[in-house]
Swiss-Prot record:
This is Polymerase basic protein 2. The gene is PB2. Influenza RNA polymerase is composed of three subunits: PB1, PB2 and PA. Interacts (via N-terminus) with PB1 (via C-terminus). Interacts with nucleoprotein NP (via N-terminus). Interacts (via N-terminus) with host MAVS (via N-terminus); this interaction inhibits host innate immune response. The keyword ATP-binding does not apply. InterPro entries: Flu_PB2_2nd, Flu_PB2_6th, Flu_PB2_C, Flu_PB2_CAP-bd, Flu_PB2_middle, Flu_PB2_N, INV_PB2, PB2_helical.
Length: 759
């Protein structure tokens, strides 16, 4: 009432009415800015102004029953005045303090589960070690980094489906949880969050942090794995760095690291096989990393590394459009070129055929320890600005750029012949020949490059052929800068093609990647990598090859047995026996093979000489191309444990030991599995019992297809005929009986009939 009187009073003064009705508000824009929309225009000011009031908060009326009017110090916690425009009460910030100290405690069981990423971070920081602070110039370059430790690698869409299913299971909308990773996560989270009282929106936010990789393009001068990025603000400034060792590892970093190691091993191994692309795919599909299929990780994981990208390209996935040369990632930032074949002469008068890029182009080069910008014309380096951690890294970048420029003085600096080969003993292409040559020794290259006087430019310094810095002179076109070059920020992916030699090209035919670009660095993987492919058996040395070969035969014994009797040549050519050949002394491989194959042929021909253990033991030796000779062997040598060890043709040895009573096979003392000999093998009897219900018709008849094993017979329909393999490696034709009544007589007649059929 009082207020209204006051306003009336004001309005009665003629000047007030005139101002309010006649004058133009010339700053309508300003008024609009501060009065339209619900978005707060100056939040910090608003906050300060609000908090300066006595009761800046509104709360539900129930608060008056739950919080006392005054605290222990006698300060008022809430006002008896109602909030204008709602039926809430005005509350002091002190009430919040009181509530936090004295309010009711609900169950906290869900907090560590919902806020898992925060709890984990606290643990990592608690156990982390912060070292001394060093003051020095920081060469930071922007890289795309993972800012969210401890996440799974779901796509945004997959994560959205999981979150909806966990947090809002009753919402309408079709959600199909299909991927390997979605199902276990959904199940686990539903169980963890039963009866959770935390607001669903908060739970959804936190789940997103756990499920999706979040990347940012940040300036970094050190470690780039997510456990380093989360403390970036503590470990590097503009002119200082603080040493830090994380207090724990997270699975996403471990996966990234192990993926790179697995991919490198696989590409290196595939490159030396007969069909690299097929081998690579076979290995990617049969490898697991930390229990997850490698192909699933490749589909979800955005890691960009040469070997990983080759594997992705082989699977038909898109990869980054930048290309790799000499371990540096090149991204063209401007210009264009056309390719032309040209023959050039090295300083040793060797002719090289190189594909010359004609035209002016600019590139960024980003390596692990150095970065650069390169401007080049046709076979001419115009300018190279390098920055790096140390002299060595800077030199590496300069060599790569000089070779990439294809300048004549570089080609003329070659001393001696270029004959570098890759792991498969094939000659490298000319550009990689040159690169390898100068990576070994770049002295002549730097001496012959040429020197120029330089102007004094801030932040830039010259570099002499012996890699010492100078402010007066520098190698032609080359400068060292304090500033790093940012990594290519785009996450754009392009469609690529790959040939059988694992060369990856973009749609215009430019080679982006090849096995030569895969790093030779060997690390130890954080997660267990399980290579099921026989091609990777040798990665853990000769013993692993030996054990794996025999385990493979035992696991596949049923099929191996049939092939042994039906199509031995196919069996001998199986790729699973390839690694074993490296254990057999080269000079005698052929003789061993000829001997074993002859022995096996006798077993096939002479009834009752079939011997499971002996076949398994000698089979890998039959895989080498055989040499016919009259030589007989009582033992065969394999190179393991740094020396030749003997496998006895008849009987046990430390290498191959079969215990008839326990049925266990041990290879070099390691258990290789259970080996079930065929029944009555020793007594050359017949598996008559197993043939009950079948009538033996006579010798094998090829029209009825390949021989079945005894186990497969059960699938025959009554009256159906089939060839069957019996214990001794002999094949007979049988028919499944139409009536069950005569089964008893089968086993008696079977014995006679088999003898007749075979003889």
């Amino acid at each position: 009432m009082e207020r209204i009187k006051e306003l009336r009073n004001l309005m009665s003064q003629s000047r007030t009415r005139e101002i309010l009705t006649k004058t133009t508000v010339d700053h309508m824009a300003i008024i609009k800015k501060y009065t339209s929309g619900r978005q707060e225009k100056n939040p910090s000011l608003r906050m300060k102004w609000m908090m300066a009031m006595k009761y800046p908060i509104t709360a539900d009326k129930r608060i008056t029953e739950m919080v006392p009017e005054r605290n222990e110090q006698g300060q008022t916690l809430w006002s008896k005045m109602s909030d204008a425009g709602s039926d809430r009460v005005m509350v002091s910030p002190l009430a919040v303090t009181w509530w936090n100290r004295n309010g009711p405690v609900t169950s906290t069981v869900h907090y560590p589960k919902v806020y898992k990423t925060y709890f984990d971070k606290v643990e990592r920081l608690k156990h982390g070690t912060f070292g001394p602070v060093h003051f020095r110039n920081q060469v930071k370059i922007r890289r795309r980094v993972d800012i969210n430790p401890g996440h799974a690698d779901l796509s945004a869409k997959e994560a959205q489906d999981v979150i909806m299913e966990v947090v809002f299971p009753n919402e309408v909308g079709a959600r199909i949880l299909t991927s390997e990773s979605q199902l276990p996560i959904t199940k686990e989270k539903k169980e963890e969050l039963q009866d959770c009282k935390i607001s669903p929106l908060m739970v959804a936010y936190m789940l997103e942090r756990e499920l999706v990789r979040k990347t940012r393009f940040l300036p970094v001068a050190g470690g780039t794995s997510s456990v380093y990025i989360e403390v970036l603000h503590l470990t590097q400034g503009t002119c200082w760095e603080q040493m830090y060792t994380p207090g724990g590892e997270v699975r996403n970093d471990d996966i990234d690291q192990s993926l790179i190691i697995a991919a490198r091993n696989i590409v290196r191994r595939a490159a030396v096989s007969a069909d690299p692309l097929a081998s690579l795919l076979e290995m990617c599909h049969s490898t697991q990393i930390g229990g997850t299929r490698m192909v699933d990780i490749l589909r979800q994981n955005p890691t960009e590394e040469q070997a990983v990208d080759i594997c992705k390209a082989a699977m038909g996935l898109r990869i980054s459009s930048s290309f790799s040369f000499g371990g540096f990632t090149f991204k063209r930032t401007s210009g264009s070129s056309i390719k032309r074949e040209e023959e050039v002469l090295t300083g040793n008068l060797q002719t090289l055929k190189i594909r010359v890029h004609e035209g002016y182009e600019e590139f960024t080069m980003v390596g692990k320890r150095a970065t650069a910008t390169l401007r080049k014309a046709t076979r001419r380096l115009v300018q190279l600005i390098v920055s790096g951690r140390d002299e060595q890294s800077i030199a590496e970048a300069i060599i790569v750029a000089m070779v990439f420029s294809q300048e004549d003085c570089m080609i003329k600096a070659v001393r001696g012949d270029l004959n570098f080969v890759n792991r498969a003993n094939q000659r490298l292409n000319p550009m990689h020949q040159l690169l390898r040559h100068f990576q070994k020794d770049a002295k002549v290259l730097f001496q012959n490059w040429g020197i120029e006087h330089i102007d004094n430019v801030m932040g830039m310094v010259g570099v002499l052929p012996d890699m010492t810095p100078s402010t007066e002179m520098s190698m032609r076109g080359i400068r060292v800068s304090k500033m790093g070059v940012d990594e290519y920020s785009s996450t754009e992916r392009v469609v690529v093609s790959i040939d059988r030699f694992l060369r990856v090209r973009d749609q215009r035919g430019n080679v982006l990647l090849s096995p030569e670009e895969v790093s030779e660095t060997h690390g130890t993987e954080k997660l267990t990598i399980t290579y099921s492919s026989s091609m990777m058996w040798e990665i853990n040395g000769p013993e692993s090859v030996l054990v794996n070969t025999y385990q493979w035969i035992i696991r596949n014994w049923e099929t191996v047995k049939i092939q042994w009797s039906q199509s031995p040549t196919m069996l001998y050519n199986k790729m699973e026996f390839e690694p074993f050949q490296s254990l057999v002394p080269k000079a005698i491989r052929g003789q061993y093979s000829g001997f074993v194959r002859t022995l096996f042929q006798q077993m096939r021909d002479v009834l009752g000489t079939f011997d499971t253990t002996q076949i398994i033991k000698l089979l890998p030796f039959a895989a080498a191309p055989p040499k016919q000779s009259r030589m007989q062997f009582s033992s065969l040598t394999v190179n393991v444990r740094g020396s030749g060890m003997r496998i006895l043709v008849r009987g046990n040895s430390p290498v191959f030991n079969y215990n008839k009573t326990t049925k266990r096979l041990t290879i070099l003392g390691k258990d290789a599995g259970t080996l079930i000999e065929d029944p009555d093998e020793s007594t050359s009897g017949v598996e008559s019992a197993v043939l009950r219900g079948f009538l033996i018709l006579g010798k094998e008849d090829r029209r009825y297809g390949p021989a079945l094993s005894i186990n497969e017979l059960s699938n025959l329909a009554k009256g159906e005929k089939a060839n069957v393999l019996i214990g001794q490696g002999d094949v007979v034709l049988v028919m499944k009986r139409k009536r069950d009544s005569s089964i008893l007589t089968d086993s008696q007649t079977a014995t006679k009939r088999i003898q007749m059929a075979i003889n």
